Amino acid sequence: MARLVGVDLPRDKRMEVALTYIYGIGRTRANEILEATGIERDLRTRDLTDDQLTHLRDYIEANLKVEGDLRREVQADIRRKMEIGCYQGLRHRRGLPVRGQRTKTNARTRKGPKRTIAGKKKAR
């Protein structure tokens, strides 16, 4: 099993898909990486040579922020917004949607399960 930046890549998947198992790399970025390193997209992870694996590892470490570094940066950005008190920071602090979605209905993922209000009756 190939290991890149602390992630075990699945052996039987094509490289284009296998790279997306790394946090911070999607399909587009995976294709850019493979093109830059000269590795075929259709090549399976199990068929990679040690040389190709080393080349991939060096390219990713030199040019991209992935996994732990990226997660830390995102968390730091959220924390900074909360500290300066901007609108997005307030939404994060209150656990509400940040990017303008409606909250009268829906938004259950961010708000959590419904809380029933005692004494409130449905209108007929």
Curated annotation (Swiss-Prot):
Domain of life of the source: Bacteria
Name of the molecule in the record: Small ribosomal subunit protein uS13
A cellular component annotation (GO) from this entry: small ribosomal subunit
Pfam families, per the entry: Ribosomal_S13
NCBIfam families hit by this protein: uS13_bact
InterPro entries xrefs: Rbsml_uS13_C (IPR027437), Ribosomal_uS13 (IPR001892), Ribosomal_uS13-like_H2TH (IPR010979), Ribosomal_uS13_bac-type (IPR019980), Ribosomal_uS13_CS (IPR018269)
Family the entry assigns: Belongs to the universal ribosomal protein uS13 family.
Species in which this protein is naturally found: Mycobacterium leprae (strain TN)
Free-text function comment from the UniProt entry: Located at the top of the head of the 30S subunit, it contacts several helices of the 16S rRNA. In the 70S ribosome it contacts the 23S rRNA (bridge B1a) and protein L5 of the 50S subunit (bridge B1b), connecting the 2 subunits; these bridges are implicated in subunit movement. Contacts the tRNAs in the A and P-sites.
Ranges for region Disordered: 98-124
Gene of this entry: rpsM
Record key words, sorted: Ribonucleoprotein, Ribosomal protein, RNA-binding, rRNA-binding, tRNA-binding
SUPFAM superfamilies linked to this entry: S13-like H2TH domain
Listed GO biological process terms: translation
Annotated HAMAP family: Ribosomal_uS13 (MF_01315)
Any one GO molecular function term: structural constituent of ribosome
Oligomer status and interactors: Part of the 30S ribosomal subunit. Forms a loose heterodimer with protein S19. Forms two bridges to the 50S subunit in the 70S ribosome.
PANTHER family per UniProt: 30S RIBOSOMAL PROTEIN S13/40S RIBOSOMAL PROTEIN S18 (PTHR10871), SMALL RIBOSOMAL SUBUNIT PROTEIN US13M (PTHR10871:SF1)
